Amino acid sequence: MIKMKNKRIRNIVTAIALIGASAAASAQTEADPDSLSAWRSVPQTTVSDGHLLGAVSSVEGDALIDPYNTNLANTLFGMVPGLFVSQANGEPGADDASLWGRGVGTFGSGRSLQIVIDGFPSTIDFFNQLSPYEIEKIELLKDAAATAIYGNRAANGVLIVTTKRGTDRPLKIDFGVRCGFQKAIRMPEYLGAYDYASLYNEALANEGKAPLYDKNALEAYRTGSNPLLYPDVDWTSEMMRSLSPVANYHLTARGGSQTVKYFVLFNGVNNTGLFKNPETAAEYGKKYRHSRYNFRTNVDVRLTPRLTAGLIIGGSVEDKYTPGTSESAWNLIDCMSSVPSNAFPVFAAEGMPGGNSMYANPLAELTERGYISYNGRTAQAAIRLTEDLGFITKGLSLSAGINFNSWFRSYSNKTRNYARYEIAKDDSGETVYNMTGEDTALSGDESSSSQWRNLAVEATLAYDRTFGKHHVSAMGRFCFDDSTTSSGSLPYRNLGFAFAVNYTYGGRYMAEFTSGYYGNDNFPPYARYGFFPAGAIGWVISNEEFLRGNGIVNLLKFRASCGLVGNADIGGSRFMYNQYWKYGGSYFFGTSNSGMDTYVEDRLANPDVTWEKDLKVNVGIDVRLLNCLSFSADWFMNRRIDILTKPYDVVPAWLGVSMPDLNIGKVDNTGVELTLGYSGLAADWRWSARGIFSYAHNKVIYNAEAPQEYSYRLGTGHIVDQPFRLEAIGFFRNHEDIDNSPKQIFGDVVPGDIKYRDQNGDGIINQDDFVPVGFTSTPEMNLGLDLGAGWRGFDIRLNFHGAFNRTVYLEGRPYQAFQNNGTVSSFALGRWTPETADTATYPRLALTGNRNNYQSSTFWTRNGNFLKLRNLQFGYTFRDSALKRARIEDIKLYLNVSNVFSLDCMDGWADPECLYGYPAVRIMSLGFNVRF
């Protein structure tokens, strides 16, 4: 124990706030989700899990530290029942994951969870910028009983983030560093010059044209005898490293007394990405790199015996430099995949990039084109006062707070053009260099920026008291927030009131009523507010006399809830209830040459526009046995109505006006969630296992779609965003096969082209033959498995994550050969030829006239299911007397690997989540953590 005076504490905390240090605390703890002694937060009140009636799942912040991720959302894979997480990009600073609560419940534009950070509304952009080291707990509120207090923001679920705060114990300092390397997972393999040229000739032959490359050229490509005139460039290896460094470091201080409690954090991450950073890049701009620094100070002060004040100051500083002309690395990846390996050498001569008028030089795009600078800043400042009103009546308290959030992004463009050179032979056989483009100076601007600011005010009156066998808790809440963006001149405002009351008799029988009354300025003044009620009941059977104290059944609880919540994020334009007019040209009266401006009616107003409404029903059970085995299950059914929809089947097109979107859409969403946990201790051994399963299936009930001649063309009755595609049934074998098959209208077909099924039997393959196929890339099922074990100082942890009932679609250059004069990947090696007609896995090659084969069809779809080992960590913790004498609590050393492997159906072509663009990465890191 370190004992010190208040002045010394203040000095150390001040120093800590100014110091930077480095990553990866290894301690992980996770609150038992079913323990009667565990507590979960509802705004400004606390409810024990034994009395909790809503569907709420949670994860402790320390459990999110192990996976090496700079984006908080990417630490949540398989961690929270009901939370669906999907990542489609591995680029540092652009690797945001998508989050859904209980899947997708609407086909409207607003599908995102409502984010609440420390009791105040926030956004997913803010959430992604948080560091795992500053998180105390993340909770997902799922049913109406848990979310109704958020009113018209609750339909998609609410994600509650609680940051760490101080304690009344002596100062604890936590310092850690982790460094390692990252490598790409499953990048496309593009063919070398010889294979590319051979397949190019084959594609020409399929079109009845003469070959472009003769035998001498093919032999030169094969042997590499003349790399200048017959180059063979692996652009992937020229531009990207097999390994690149990463670093993460953190420093926290936590402690306090009965009077002052504090938590201070600094966390920094650095990533230089997978691109090579040649020294030549320094002349024309920045090398690729991404960094982010998080800071936080949370302080709680007891001003009087009854009054406490809480202060929050937090934020992040993010900087990213991307070579080239785009903020995203996608352009560099696309350029790399567009240039054939035999197009030109990397350099025509020293200091002279190869290139021609058709293709840019990928390496020069990386090193010669300048850079885009991206700078992001987030800030949160909040203060909350809480007064104990026990002098009025026991258990009464009043809390009020104000919060300011700022999210700012700026972009600086510093780009240039460069000369590139094509090698050729003149008539005398001399080597000449034909120049395309010219070298220019760096130029650009710094005028591009975006900003979001939010001011929120909240006040809560809470009551919590026990009268014998009767326990009553209640709260009333007022909240207001005002948001402004750089792209809009008018603010976005929300105002609401909430009320909740919970009654428990004898710790066995429970009833709860929650409600919200919320308004949003996007709706008509006469219909701006809505009432969102919910009710829940529960029975803790384990507290009945016949089960109490039996030693086997520690908890057995049934619960059920039903209620109505809303979603004000409906999309469309603002203030749709207003009628707007637009310029309609000039009208000439009489013989005058001067016309009068006219105005015509724009899209019709919708005076009844309103929010989406979601009727939620939830039934659940929580079980804990022998103080080591826990189980919970939930079944839910949601009916979303009043989804903003284009009224294609309501108003005929010949009406002559643009109709407004109407609140007439309906979607059902049903599913189940299961959680099973086990933990144990024996002598020096300890172990734990926790598995979660989430299933959510949606169905469009009504979307006002236009009538179709064939019912299978309707989206109604299918999942939201149901893909419609042609059904591929093989390849045409010969001309006789073509003549005897339905006519495909997408272009002339020849043997080796994809053959489609005639769904309606009319002898023609056209738009009427597109049918519902598979799922979307958003999974319907999620699986998580967290395994841990330890012996004395050793520990090991594994995190598995699976996603099922998902379909992915392959498109673009990595999968479609010669697309837009691009290159060819190994994906096309199984192409159709007369000799491989029975075993071909890819259509015949062609340079032009390939429109038939690139139709959206089942040929290009793949089963997107996967099971990944997301995280593996092995460590050892030192706790001996020598460390204690040095006032060191413990030191931990550990090895961590993220994205260890994936079991999927992609046959090694690509990662099932990151199909194209910047690849997913595997990170191997070593770290140490010291606690004082």
Question: Positions of the model-derived regions?
Answer:
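Conserved small-residue
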Residues: 174-227, 325-326, 681-777, 817
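Short, small/polar-rich motifs associated with maturation and membrane association
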Residues: 1-295, 309, 760
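Short, solvent-exposed loop/turn motifs
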Residues: 121-122, 353, 357, 431, ...
